[in-house]
Amino acid sequence: MGNGLSKALIVLIRIYQRWISPLFLPTCRYTPSCSAYAVEAIARYGAVKGTYLAIRRILRCHPFAVGGYDPVPTTCPDPCNESSPPNPPC
């Protein structure tokens, strides 16, 4: 989780999880939830790559998404290569 920016982002997400998210019905179609995914991605890959992965995940989470198990990838996909799958197989 290295730097201060990563820690600050994770604290903000934890505040959201604790105080804001409970005010709404569960809407995330994936496991882990989008906020849990964001925390793990930022902790694993740092603020920039982790935020990039979290944004991609949030954009995939919509009413027409099939959903299901969608873990943080074990290797970070190249943001310049959008043809790479969202989560490469392990």
Curated annotation (Swiss-Prot):
Record field: transmembrane: none
Any one GO cellular component localisation term in the record: plasma membrane
Locations listed in the record: Cell inner membrane
Membrane topology label: Peripheral membrane protein
Family according to the record: Belongs to the UPF0161 family.
PANTHER family per the UniProt record, alphabetical: MEMBRANE PROTEIN INSERTION EFFICIENCY FACTOR-RELATED
Function recorded in the entry: Could be involved in insertion of integral membrane proteins into the membrane.
Protein name: Putative membrane protein insertion efficiency factor
Phylogenetic classification of the source organism: Bacteria, Bacillati, Cyanobacteriota, Cyanophyceae, Acaryochloridales
